[in-house]
Amino acid sequence: MNTYLSEITNLIYYINLKEVCMLYNNIKSYLLSGITVILLTGHPVIAADNVSKPDNKSQTAYLQHPPDLRPFSIFDYYLDNMFEHKLSAYSSSAIRTKFITQDKQYILVLEVPGYDKSQIKVKVNSNKLFITGNVEQNNKSEASDDYTKRNFNYVVSLYEDVDQNNISSNLKNGILTITLPRIEVKEKDAKEIPIQ
């Protein structure tokens, strides 16, 4: 075991990930028995107590092994992201968008299946375009009390050259198309600020 500890201390400043993997494979039986090597999280480097005294008989090495060598690390992704994803197919993240730039206009396309014109609102205010959709269905019957609610909200910052008075929108076959006409914007003169 002391040869492995001395090997760890000799590699303190010259270690890389590949060497850590090889070293871990050499000493993993000792790690599993928990004799002298302590696993910690932190930076992927190796450090040891009393490095300046190599003849010291009681050395403790700290080793962080790569994540792919940790037991149960395959579950980290699923456990970390368990509550971040919504199960609804109609969540706001499920709505696909596309922004098209043309010479005389911008076109914003949103895929909003299942929404009709009365359930979608498009508003413009202070160089921002607000697009909201809301569906509430109450399907009461003798067999069940089903209630469905789904919505989305998008806010788009408009460029300076968008003619906000002539924006138009169209909904057809679950595709919302918003046309943003462009106007010529005169470049403002720069104002020089004197340095005092």
Swiss-Prot record:
Query: Which UniProt keywords are listed?
Result: Plasmid, Stress response
InterPro entries reported for this sequence:
A-crystallin/Hsp20_dom (IPR002068), HSP20-like_chaperone (IPR008978), HSP21-like (IPR044587)
- Which gene carries the instructions for this protein? hspc3-1
What SUPFAM superfamilies does the record point to? Answer: HSP20-like chaperones (SSF49764)
Q: Which family does it belong to?
A: Belongs to the small heat shock protein (HSP20) family.
**Species name for this entry?**
Rickettsia felis (strain ATCC VR-1525 / URRWXCal2) (Rickettsia azadi)
Task: Give start and end of each sHSP domain.
Answer: 88-196
Q: Which top-rank group of organisms is this from?
A: Bacteria
Q: Please state what the protein is called.
A: Small heat shock protein C3
Biological process GO terms, please? Answer: response to heat
